[in-house]
Swiss-Prot record:
Organism this protein belongs to: Mycobacterium phage L5
Organism domain of life: Viruses
Protein name: Minor tail protein Gp27
Length: 336
């Protein structure tokens, strides 16, 4: 049987092994368990006393428990082509507390990777001295805490062209959004870019938005601890970021306004409700200034396209807003 599937491992130390061609004398063995197909899933049901059968409540993907073997060749008694050297290099690529990446590349689906860590120590049969055999099989017991296969993230950006900076002391806080100078930015993602979400999983957009390029007047940088920032004179940027719902028409055009972002507050906005909503480059708790308002919408599987409209204020020309979309899959191939 001839296959054009390429399986590679990138170790925690950056070392890379092609397990299909065996470029380092290490080949993927047969009977791989728990790796290449769908992850295990637990379905939660309820069984009311007055209801026949059961009703679906929810389900969640579980961790992957993966067992596979590698064939390690012994092509020399000593040196880099010996079993001892190759087995050592293979073991150094793994760790219990760090993840390596298992890559699978196919002509149909491109390259996807799964993050793996050791779950148990590798095992080798010691019926005889493995240094004297032509090859040896090492059995790997691994765990994938994140059960999904990933393509590289897709990143889209929009750059400001208009100078929308202003003097914050012109108004008395709170600053009236309607009166601030603004620029509208647009990011369109469609079939030409591979689709908005071509995967079989829900995804959560990640945004990056820049803080002001101007420091706070007459105030030291970095900000001294326990000294109040003079917000009334601090230049800031502010944005209206899309939180579109693709499944509820009422919130089809939902957008949220960020707090004002001063110098040093370049932020990452993660719309996944399980993660910190807004993380600032300076470490300041920008999320606390959202007044409890949260992003809550994801992008459903197989969503083809959308145009995202962003309003920006307080920006210098050339500042960039980015949209990052992850690509999680249940399998290492197919499902397009």
């Amino acid at each position: 049987m001839i296959t054009d599937t390429i399986v590679e491992l990138e170790g925690v130390n950056g070392e890379r092994f092609n397990l299909t061609t065996g470029d380092q004398g290490v080949y993927l063995a047969t009977d791989v368990e728990g790796c290449f197909y769908d992850p295990p899933v637990k379905v939660v049901v309820e069984e009311p006393g007055n209801y026949p059968g059961a009703r679906y409540l929810s389900h969640r993907a579980l961790k992957r428990d993966i067992v596979f073997g590698v064939v390690i060749l012994n092509d020399a008694k000593q040196g880099p082509r010996s079993w001892l050297s190759r087995d050592s290099e293979w073991r150094k690529a793994w760790a219990f507390n760090r993840t390596c990446k298992l890559y699978v590349t196919t002509p149909d689906s491109g390259t996807r990777y799964l993050k793996l860590a050791l779950f148990e120590s590798p095992t080798v049969k010691m019926d005889t001295d493995p240094r004297g055999k032509p090859l040896e099989v090492t059995v790997m017991s691994c765990i994938a805490y994140d059960p999904f296969w990933y393509e590289d993230d897709k990143v889209f950006s929009a750059k400001t062209k208009t100078d929308t900076r202003f003097d914050p002391s012109f108004w008395t806080p709170p600053w009236p959004w309607e009166e601030l100078p603004k620029e509208t930015l647009r990011i369109k993602v469609g079939r030409e870019q591979g689709g908005l979400n071509p995967t079989d999983q829900y995804i959560f957009p990640k945004w990056t938005v820049p803080g002001s390029t101007e420091k706070v007047p007459n105030f030291p940088w970095p900000f001294p601890p326990n000294v109040p920032i003079p917000w009334e004179t601090a230049p800031f940027t502010q944005f209206v970021i899309p939180d579109y719902s693709f499944e509820d028409e009422e919130f089809r055009n939902r957008r949220l306004k960020t707090p004002g972002l001063i110098y040093g507050e370049n932020c990452v906005i993660d719309t996944d409700r399980r993660e910190e909503q807004i993380a600032s480059e300076s470490g300041s708790p920008v999320w606390a200034r959202m007044n409890g308002v949260r992003f809550r919408n994801s992008i459903p599987p197989y969503t083809e396209e959308a145009e995202f409209v962003i309003d920006a204020s307080g920006c210098a020309p050339g500042q960039v807003v980015t949209l990052r979309l992850t690509r999680p899959w249940s399998r290492c191939w197919g499902l397009e």
